[in-house]
Structures are given as structure tokens and as C-alpha cells.
A protein has these predicted regions:
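Histidine-rich, glycine-flanked metal-binding segment
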Residues: 2-54
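Divalent metal-coordination and catalytic microenvironments
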Residues: 15, 20, 50, 61, ...
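Active-site gating loops and adjacent loop-to-helix segments of metal-dependent hydrolytic enzymes
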Residues: 68-100, 107, 134-142, 210-237, ...
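Small-aliphatic-rich amphipathic alpha-helix that forms the alpha element of a beta-alpha
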Residues: 100-118
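A structural motif
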Residues: 112-114, 136, 199, 259
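Metal-coordinating catalytic core of metallo-dependent amide/deamination hydrolases
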Residues: 126-244
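Active-site-adjacent C-terminal substructures of enzyme catalytic domains
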Residues: 233-279
Length: 279
């Protein structure tokens, strides 16, 4: 089954794979038989009768290594969850822990039909290594908060040079300021120089909770979306994650600037953040 506009939808047929590429998609018995003859005895055939072949799913927002924290720190709103539980937990993790958590989370995604994901986390190079080993496609985004910005630009530049386009272009590297309430305007602007220099995108949490919206209004006299627009975040390919609490003006800004909004209903319910205004 294909769902792309202008492409045919095959309801009965075959998919042929050569190496790591799709070599044939057809519902023509003649084309399928010809392909089988050309490949000869080396062709392996899997009977997919009663099954569905479709494009892989894409998970647009992850902290994949947090799979290690499943079942931990339930029944808390976002800020107590972060400050009292998650950040202290993360402070005890090292790169090997992040790699192990990424391997587990990636394996679970692949089992569920997800073949590509976007990640934002610490030790992003280890997430990239786990993605390369697994065969999945990934956009890995080294994250920063304001208290841990020293050296970020230099480290991320090195990571872009090493991993952006790696593994046959399966891996991309983007920039990830954590959120407008945890990063200063100066830090966000500085991180955006990486986007300008390398042609990469930016991945950031936006308007996740009412308290965030109130904090940004108090600090800057704007909504989080207006604040990030004025900093130039949306001048690059941008993923705005959550966007639970938006004004009509916010929505117009995001639409006009071509920002991709990523809705996270399970996260927003778990942390009592609210319900995004999805039409």
C-alpha cells in the first residue's frame, strides 16, 4: 500500500528488495515473474499472503534513551517531573547508558513498524551509533539547556561533521535548544549559527504548558512562538514540539513560516500538560 499523492496504490502484488534498497513494487504478474527469472536461484521469497506491506512509520519526537525510565516518576506534572525526578536521574547516566537505552527503544520502534525517528537528547553521538547499527533512519539532535551550554557549539559542529549524512544518508544531525524557558535568547541565537553554517534544522519544545507560556510572557512580553520567531528559530527547517497552548496569532506564525508542529498526546496526558488545539 502506498499513500503518496499521485502514486499508484497496489492492493495485490510483490515488493522486491536488493541489499538495502527497494528494487521493485508491482502488481503485474508478468513483471514479478520476470524479476524472479532474472534473479534466479539466489532469490529468497517470503509469502506475505494476508499481510500488509506499507511505508514505514515515522516517530517525530523522541528522547529514545528514556526508554530506561519507563514506569518511573508517574503522576507528576512536567516541572516537578523534570526537576525532582528526571534531571537527577539523567545526571547519573553516562554514554554507555544512553547507548543501551537507545538500542532498546530503537528495537521496540522497529518491531512496531517505525523505520525513522527524530531524537533530542544528551550524548547524541551514542544515539547516532545505535541508530547506525540498527539500520533505522534517524535525525539525532544534541540537546542543551542554559546551565550546560559551554562548548555546545563546538561539540555539535564536530558531531555534524562526523554523523550528518552517515550510513548512506540514514543519519542526520539537527540542533536542539531544549525550550525557550530553559535557554537564554543569546544561547539560542548562538546555536542557530550551526544551522546557518551547515544547512541543518532545529528541534525545540514549544508552549508545552501554561506555566511555560506565563514564564515567557513575564520575561519577554511575548508568547513562546512569538519569542522564537523573533530570535530567528523559524527561519530554518524547524520542528516545534508540543504546541499545546497556542493563540490564533501563534498558529498563523507557524503556518506562515512553514514550521512543522509535532503533537505528543500521550506525553501531554501523562504530564497533565493539556490538549493541543488539533483541528
Amino acid at each position: 500500500m502506498t499513500e503518496q499523492p499521485g502514486r499508484p496504490k497496489y492492493y495485490r502484488g510483490a515488493v522486491a528488495i536488493s541489499g538495502d534498497r527497494i528494487a521493485l513494487v508491482s502488481d503485474s504478474p508478468q513483471r514479478i515473474e520476470r524479476y524472479e527469472r532474472e534473479r534466479g536461484e539466489g532469490l529468497q521469497v517470503a509469502d506475505g499472503a494476508g499481510r500488509l506491506v506499507m511505508p514505514g512509520l515515522i516517530n517525530l519526537h523522541n528522547h529514545v534513551s528514556m526508554t530506561l525510565m519507563r514506569g518511573y516518576a508517574d503522576d507528576l506534572p512536567l516541572m516537578p517531573w523534570l526537576t525532582e525526578k528526571i534531571w537527577p536521574f539523567e545526571a547519573k547516566l553516562d554514554g554507555d547508558d544512553i547507548y543501551s537505552g537507545a538500542e532498546l527503544g530503537i528495537a521496540e520502534m522497529l518491531l512496531g513498524g517505525t523505520t525513522a525517528f527524530v531524537d533530542m537528547y544528551w550524548y547524541a553521538d551514542r544515539v547516532a551509533e545505535a541508530a547506525i547499527r540498527s539500520g533505522i533512519r534517524a535525525v539525532v539532535s544534541p540537546a542543551f539547556v542554559g546551565t550546560a551550554f559551554d562548548g555546545y557549539v563546538e561539540r555539535t559542529q564536530r558531531m555534524i561533521e562526523r554523523y550528518n549524512g552517515a550510513a548512506g544518508d540514514r543519519i542526520r544531525v539537527w540542533v536542539a535548544p531544549h525550550a525557550p524557558y530553559t535557554c537564554t535568547p543569546e544561547q539560542i541565537r548562538e546555536s542557530l549559527k550551526l544551522c546557518e553554517r551547515n544547512g541543518v534544522g532545529v528541534n525545540i519544545h514549544v508552549a508545552e504548558t501554561l506555566s511555560e507560556v506565563e514564564t515567557i510572557r513575564e520575561r519577554y512580553g511575548k508568547t513562546p512562538v512569538e519569542h522564537l520567531r523573533d530570535l530567528g528559530v523559524f527561519d530554518y527547517r524547524a520542528l516545534a514540539v508540543h504546541c499545546v497552548h497556542l493563540t490564533e496569532t501563534d498558529m498563523e506564525i507557524l503556518s506562515r513560516q512553514g514550521v512543522s508542529v509535532v503533537y505528543n498526546p500521550q506525553s501531554n496526558m501523562k504530564l497533565a500538560s493539556g490538549i493541543a488545539p488539533v483541528a
